[in-house]
Structure formats: C-alpha cells, structure tokens
Amino acid sequence: GVSAPAQEERPSRPEGAGTGSQVVGEPIGARLRRWRPFLIVTAALAVVALATSLMQPTTSKIPYAIDNPKGNGTQALAQLLRDEGLRVRSADSASEAAAAGPGTTVAVVNIGLLTDDQRAALARSGADITVVGALYQNFDGLTAGMVPQGASATGVLAPHCRDDDAVAAEALAGSRGSVSVDEDAGAAGCFPVGEDRFAYATARLPGGGRLRVIADADLVTNGALARSGHAALAIRALGHHEQLLWFDASQSGPPSVWDTP
C-alpha cells in the first residue's frame, strides 16, 4: 500500500520559553502593554519628585538676604511684611531697582558698592528708598542731606523726633553706625547716638520718593528683629507701599550691556 508521508520534524521549543517569556520577535504592542504599569509608576514618581522640589522653599546663607533663615538673614522681616499684605521680592541689578518707580519701596543693602550714577538713578526713580546699613557706605549721588558716620551707641535710644515711624518704634537697642543730617537740605534725624549723629533719618528725594536710612543693618536681621522697637521701625520704614523690592548691591554682578541705560 501507499505509505503515509513522513512528517517534518519541528525544532523543539527552548526549555523555559513559554508564552510571554520570549522577548526577541515579540510584537511592539505586546511589549508596551507589558511595560505600561512600569511606565505609569515611573511617570508618577517623577511628578511627585518635581512637585516636592517645587514646594520646598529655597534658602540662602547670604547676610541680610530675605530668604536667609539664619540669625544674619532677614527672612523673618520679609515674612512679617508679607503678612501685612506686601509683595516682597529681590532685585538682581541696580537697573532693575532703579526701574521700580512710584508706588514701590526699594530696600538697598551695601549701597556704597554702587556708583554715583547708580545711586543718582535710584534717587530719580520716584520710588521710596530705604537704605539698610550706613556704616562704611557712601551716599554720593543719592542725597546731599545725609552723610554716613561711624558714631555708635550700645544703650537704649529714644526717638527724640516727630517722625511717625520713629515715634511708633519707641526705642532702639543701640546702633552700630549713624548718619549726620543737613536740615537745610530737608533731612531729619531720629534716635540720636551723639551730637548730630542719628540711628535713623529721612529726607525727600529729587524724584519725589522718600529716603529713609536705618543706620545699623543688623537691627532688621532675624537675630535682632525682636529687640526693642526694631520690628516696628523696620516694618514701617519698608511698608509704605504694597511693593517692596529688596536689593543687595554686593550680590549684583558687574554692569553688562543689559544694565546700561
């Protein structure tokens, strides 16, 4: 009779290569379906990590910085001002500070590092300027009514003036540094530390703003803010407008083409 055709011998499946265990040659759709849970979890973790990093406030160790929580920082003052409804932010350059304009207070630390022209631009800006720290500084170009002085005091100081902000503060726990004032130029001094030497002073600026000087920058730091009337004076001297721009001239880079008028 006719013999049955010989059956072709098929290659045996490799041991352990069951369904789903063979990757080579697996359709891309199947791979994606298998990887989908892993991809979803990875994406979720990335989102959580990003959100966490964004929610964590950044801090610095720069003296007098509004994001410095240490004793030499001013983060507490910045928070108090925000609690009063102010919008508080930092300026990165002298040109940005000078562009603030009316309706803004610009707090300036290390003002002596600016040029005469940069200080003059601040004076003409129309903004209120509050100088934080007068010791070893230079006011040329800013005002002719005040001159930084080295006279200091360690005892409690009383206002001895009619300025509303100084009267509200009531007292300062001394002052490292001071300013002399020229009353004929419209300047007035408070909290005297000696003859014609004051821990706080004010004057009118040519641009229409008001100049206020807190001679001792340490008075507004986290470590000293709770003493005497420091907080009251700082909040009032910086809180006359809803916008506060904090500018530390020591943290500003050298003038670039973007900073030139």
Language-model-derived ranges and their functions:
Residues G1-P261:
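Short, surface-exposed patches at the edges or C-terminal ends of soluble domains, predominantly
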